[in-house]
Amino acid sequence: VVGLMKNEDMSDENNLFLRMDESPFRFQVFKGSENKYSKGGFEVANKEDFEDATKQLFDLGIAFHDEGEDLAKVRCVKELISFNDPAGNSLELFYGRDIDKNEFKSSQDISGFVTHGLGLGHLVFGTLEAEAAHDFYTQVMEFGDSDIMRMRFTPDPNDPESVIYFMHCDNPRHHTVGIMLAPTPPSGLIHAMVEVETAEQVVDAMDRATSNNIHISSTLGRHMNDKMFSFYMQTPAGFMLEFGYDGIQPDWDVHETTNSEAPSYWGHEFNMPEA
């Protein structure tokens, strides 16, 4: 449905490694006791930046674990550490990602995913510790605020207003991490996003999802903050996958944090599956 490429050399009966580009993998799916999101990885440019980041975590008293050579080999990187954000989300930080010698070929003839210099897409977490998590990503991880959305997500005027912090790292993608003031879902993640090169590929993916009886969590729509044309579908792990096209890439030297009061210009009517 999504059109990723299985890395045959790395995958086995317990692990599925999925490619989006020249990287050996961008997603790893493994057998576990629960169907849910596990952890996300963030890349720094080089060993010097990696050592600076680990020193900053140490100086701030934030616990982290050096994962060693064995896991680094599995992750196809030079070195990595792991730690948690204040919401309990497990994160990894690494440098020196390997390049796969084999050409990327989409399983669904997708011309390409928009990843180069941008990462796999974005992740949006739900937590009741949203302020602490926001401070962590902006002050410790040194992300920047792209957009802050404050709105009521139900028609009930008595329901409290929620907030979503959309944050960017050191690349042009509008946001790499979102933090929503909401209970952490059982899946551990609200949604992940992948981006393709044409609107037609978004519509084709929605058709494939429907044909394969994948629950469509949201209709097609155009987001206000990053201008992404997309739809959302439910994954077997329980979180949503946003499949999009045409997200903006701001110039961070001139960008000023925006304040949204609605998620979309049009569309994106959500229909969540029954628990």
PLM ranges: what are they?
Residues 10, 32, 71-75, 155-159, ...:
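A short beta-turn/loop motif at secondary-structure boundaries
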Residues 1-25, 125-174:
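Core segments of cupin and vicinal oxygen chelate
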